[in-house]
């Protein structure tokens, strides 16, 4: 697979998914500003855990203040969206500079988590749970 290197100053778009959440990221060189669905990062993700997920790829390449991120996240919950953003940012960084691939791969940031919610089966109250069994 050949990687085409994108000019360093042009914006880069990438997509990431987790469970039912989808995130689209536009990454461009800047001073570390992050906007998700038109809101600032601190307002969209009030807890540190979610913000850490988004910044993890940038911390690995030591570029937290090098890039501006404009993102759209939809579907799922906050953690699913944060993890979808993490994958999207990682993919965008590789498009920006393919040499980041080994660093991000080593940290497991390029793997799409395939786990999804298991469907509810007929004749049971949930995916695995059974109705109470009565012998008599």
Curated annotation (Swiss-Prot):
Pfam families: Ribosomal_S9 (PF00380). Keywords: Ribonucleoprotein, Ribosomal protein. Residues 117-136 have a biased composition (Basic residues). SUPFAM superfamilies: Ribosomal protein S5 domain 2-like (SSF54211). One of its GO terms (cellular component) is small ribosomal subunit. Gene3D superfamilies: 3.30.230.10. The keyword rRNA-binding does not apply. GO terms for molecular function: RNA binding; structural constituent of ribosome. Residues 111-136 are annotated as: Disordered. The keyword Nuclease does not apply. GO terms for biological process: translation. It comes from the Bacteria. Belongs to the universal ribosomal protein uS9 family. This is Small ribosomal subunit protein uS9. It comes from Methylacidiphilum infernorum (isolate V4). The lineage of its organism: Bacteria, Pseudomonadati, Verrucomicrobiota, Methylacidiphilae, Methylacidiphilales. The gene is rpsI.
């Amino acid at each position: 697979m050949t990687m085409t290197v994108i000019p360093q100053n042009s914006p880069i778009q990438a997509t990431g998914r987790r469970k039912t959440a989808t995130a689209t990221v536009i990454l461009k060189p800047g001073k570390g500003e992050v906007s998700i669905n038109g809101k600032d990062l601190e307002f969209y993700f009030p807890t540190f855990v979610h913000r850490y997920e988004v910044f993890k790829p940038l911390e690995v390449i030591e570029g937290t203040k090098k890039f501006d991120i404009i993102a759209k996240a939809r579907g799922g919950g906050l953690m699913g969206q944060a993890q979808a953003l993490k994958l999207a940012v990682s993919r965008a960084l590789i498009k920006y500079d393919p040499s980041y691939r080994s660093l991000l791969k080593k940290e497991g940031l390029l793997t799409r988590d395939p786990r999804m919610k298991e469907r509810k089966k007929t004749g049971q109250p949930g995916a695995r749970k059974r109705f109470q069994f009565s012998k008599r």
